[in-house]
Amino acid sequence: MGEIFVSGPDAETFVNFIFTNEIRGFEPGKVLYGMMCHPDGGVVDDLLVYREFEPEHFLLVVNAANIDKDFAWIEEQSKKFDVKVVNESDSWGQIAVQGPDAEKTVLDVLGLAPAADLAFYTYYEAEWNGTRMVVSRTGYTGEDGFELYTTHENIVEIWNKLIEAGVKPCGLGCRDTLRFEAGLPLYGDELSETITPIEAGLGMFCKLDKEFIGRDVLAMQKEEGTAKKLVGIEIEDKAIPRASYPVESEDGTQVGVVTTGYHSISLDKSICFAMVQT
């Protein structure tokens, strides 16, 4: 993941302007999910926003594949605001500890005792080797868990401790099946610069009673409807629908395209997300 820090007298106003969710009144130690949009409503990226304990300081956690694009876009939008935008992605990293034993693991293996008191989508700040670490009760798996942010050197040490303790390493393929079964979107599949949050069914993360980039288009889509929308499909046979497969109506007319498809371990069925015409 990418870690971008925003600070300065206009930090709250600026982040609220580029972020679809509402951060005013959002307390330090809390985490919010939302998106950054272009004026036409297309999604620049989806991200987590952390309100830090120091006033007018925010951490924006963006998708790793979008770091350079996101940072350039955020910098461009910031020119009219009194803020400092710093990309720490080259020096910071993240480890996600997820699953039913996540709390026990961060307590017993890593000694992060305060983590047990965290509610979902909250965080606290700790130290590892005398340097800052963010311990966040968040994740992208549909499971309980924690995401740990700190310097690359610390991340390597923490990773080794977890592996030595018998924690199973999992890659993005595993993560992708879990997020999919949990109904969570992935940028590049269910969200993109040509797919809006409303089309992706994420309107609950767009607070249309405030101003933000892309707000007018999203408000119109919510009021008037959209030409396409994201749906879930259950496959009747054992075939696995893959991304980019066409979705056809009964008469053979293509009405959409698969965005993500897997054999669901939980359901023992083939299922997919698809973007279809309305």
Task: Go through the PLM ranges and name each one.
Residues 22-77:
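Well-ordered mid-protein domain cores that form the structural environment of catalytic cofactors
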Residues 8-21, 44-52, 96-107, 189:
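Charged, low-complexity, helix/coiled-coil-prone segments
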Residues 53-278:
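Conserved, structured C-terminal
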